[in-house]
């Protein structure tokens, strides 16, 4: 069986031993300088290949364990960075104005850049205050509430750039298009937003950081994780629970305000609960 090669590169026998995995583990961490989470993602693929070969009877059956690691602390945009990015530009400069609108949209929805790039005018229901997100990582469309502060920003943008000559919105058109009015893909849109950030003196350029920022501020303000799960489009609570754990220290002001111990008062030798109205 050792003569049979996997992918014409690797003999299958290496999948039968822990020795190669240990060496590969060190190679990834030390030479490629990947973190533990990236390492785990790589080894999940490795394990899937090994289990497939076991099912086929090509190699001996054994258990392959992957040690869970604590998620890294999520970086977010700071208050000062957000303030710089939210300074409103002139509507005449389409690209800068469009990017400013997208930053506002990120802060209102926490959507992924792929969802933003595929958003159409018809997905925006201003009467009901609903946004339909048709493109998501989990492939399940969702309907989320449109923040009141976001409405006039989107309406003004659409009136300037996404209406026909009669002032009627182009319902089938993409909201955040390129300079020619055509669809702007997530990669191109992300690159443009990165340039926008740098032009405002913000060195962080990742669009995904806006999801982390949204989640952190949601948790800070006392928002529940079930609603956060729906808004962010996660199928399970696992990821939002991670957000909750990562940003637990940021809930201290809420603990100080709402913890029952802070509402207890001593009166004439008796302890009473004083509920705030």
Model regions: which residues?
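Catalytic-site neighborhood detector that most strongly recognizes the C-terminal catalytic loop/helix
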Residues: 76, 135, 232, 236-257
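Basic, Lys/Arg- and aromatic-enriched nucleic-acid-binding interface segment
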Residues: 84-113
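C-terminal catalytic core of tyrosine-transesterase DNA break-rejoin enzymes
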Residues: 104, 108, 195, 211-235, ...
């Amino acid at each position: 069986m050792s003569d049979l090669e996997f992918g014409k590169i690797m003999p299958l026998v290496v999948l039968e031993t822990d020795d190669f995995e240990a060496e590969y583990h060190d190679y990834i961490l030390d030479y490629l300088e990947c973190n533990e989470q990236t390492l785990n993602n790589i080894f999940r693929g490795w394990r899937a290949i090994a289990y497939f070969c076991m099912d086929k009877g090509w190699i001996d059956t054994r258990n392959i364990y992957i040690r869970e690691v604590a998620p890294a602390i999520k970086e977010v945009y700071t208050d000062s960075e957000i303030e710089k990015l939210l300074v409103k530009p002139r509507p005449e400069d389409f690209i800068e104005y469009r990017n400013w609108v997208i930053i506002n949209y990120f802060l209102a929805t926490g959507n992924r850049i792929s969802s933003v790039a595929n958003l159409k005018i018809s997905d925006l229901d201003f009467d009901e205050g609903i946004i339909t997100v048709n493109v998501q990582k989990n492939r399940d469309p969702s309907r989320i509430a449109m923040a009141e502060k976001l409405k006039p920003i989107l309406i003004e943008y659409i009136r300037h750039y996404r209406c026909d000559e009669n002032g009627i919105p182009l319902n089938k058109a993409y909201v955040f298009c390129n300079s020619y009015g055509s669809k702007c893909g997530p990669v191109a849109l992300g690159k443009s937003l990165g340039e926008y950030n740098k032009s405002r003196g913000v060195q962080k350029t990742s669009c995904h950081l806006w999801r982390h920022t949204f989640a952190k501020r949601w948790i800070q303000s006392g928002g529940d994780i079930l609603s956060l799960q729906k808004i962010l489009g996660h199928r399970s609570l696992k990821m939002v629970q991670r957000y909750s754990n990562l940003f637990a220290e940021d809930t201290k002001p809420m603990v100080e305000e709402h913890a029952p111990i802070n509402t207890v008062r001593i009166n004439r030798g008796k302890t009473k609960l004083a509920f705030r109205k």
